Amino acid sequence: MERLKVELGERSYPIEIAAGLLQHAEVLTQTIKGKRVMIVTNTVVAPLYLERIIQLLSGFQVEHLILPDGEAYKTLATFERIMSALLETNHGRDTTLIALGGGVIGDVVGFAAASYQRGIPFIQVPTTLLSQVDSSVGGKTAVNHPLGKNMIGAFYQPKHVVIDTECLKTLPAREFAAGMAEVIKYGIIWDAEFFSWLETNMSRLQALEPAALAYAIRRCCEIKADVVTQDETEHGVRALLNLGHTFGHAIEAEKGYGNWLHGEAVAAGMMMAASTAEARGDLDARQLARIRDLLLAANLPIQAPADMDFSAFIRHMRRDKKVLEGKLRLVLPVGIGHAQVVADVSDDELLAVIESGRE
């Protein structure tokens, strides 16, 4: 078993990674302090893993809530359902929430944990590749608003992240590919050697080879933990984790949440960011081609929707959380393995990239 730690003083927490972790009760129960637990999951994950988790928690008073599946349900209405479920059964501050599912479940349950009675503990049990390598670690919790993604939320750290790589065996191929976008992101912004490893080992990952999966997930979590330890609330280096997300969030908001998976939109966004960097002279043509080829090898889109023009992108991008003093700030790669935040990308530069980057 791989065991990492996010070092945040009194709020530090472990990340545990292995195949078959959800067969062992002690892994899940070690950070639960009270006697009451509420598991929140969705209609896809519940038939696969809910009963198993309930059995692991045989010594606790366990309730569960099953939500609809999909990004379309990452809303204030879903958040309110969780609040109502907790209130109706008189849960207190000693209750532990368990987020059993992918990124949507993790984000909305984390936000509920941050908000209920001003904060109760929660545990992340991510079941998708995207949530295992990215969204379950770092304490970003949120719901979407019709005008923007993740606009309502909080920084609130889990008590524990339990990553069972066996869960990926039940993940649809499209969802696996979407998760690979975040894996590739870490190589682009932080670790050129990891990027090269991905170029060589993509087929092993797609074949779900246990050793390859364990290494990739661990490396992503190591990078994420390092970044979060340095900059928990995203005032500096953590912003680099948003590579592709400014363009990507615009695609998601414009096309309707869930029509493009988050990872698919981020992949197209990373290609647009890389193209912007190449046009500015910060990325050479060979590096741009390597990024494009790796995204394609992962079965990810490299172009934005054909019917999404400059005005649609800009309308959403101006609402991005990285906008500062009215200036749009973009994360752009500087070679492979490094990235920077820039605030001087002109509308003409964006127009050129958007027009050339559509299907």
From Swiss-Prot:
It catalyses: 7-phospho-2-dehydro-3-deoxy-D-arabino-heptonate = 3-dehydroquinate + phosphate. Keywords: Amino-acid biosynthesis, Aromatic amino acid biosynthesis, Cobalt, Cytoplasm, Lyase, Metal-binding, NAD, Nucleotide-binding, Zinc. InterPro entries: Dehydroquinate_synthase, DHQ_synth_AroB, DHQ_synth_fam, DHQS/DOIS_N, DHQS_C. Pathway: Metabolic intermediate biosynthesis; chorismate biosynthesis; chorismate from D-erythrose 4-phosphate and phosphoenolpyruvate: step 2/7. Catalyzes the conversion of 3-deoxy-D-arabino-heptulosonate 7-phosphate (DAHP) to dehydroquinate (DHQ). This is 3-dehydroquinate synthase. Its main location: cytoplasm. NAD(+) binds at residues 69-74, 103-107, 127-128, 140, 149, 167-170. Binds 1 divalent metal cation per subunit. Can use either Co(2+) or Zn(2+). Its EC number is 4.2.3.4. Zn(2+) binds at residues 182, 245, 262. CDD domains: DHQS. It comes from Aeromonas salmonicida (strain A449). One of its GO terms (biological process) is chorismate biosynthetic process. The lineage of its organism: Bacteria, Pseudomonadati, Pseudomonadota, Gammaproteobacteria, Aeromonadales. Its cofactor is Co(2+); Zn(2+); NAD(+).
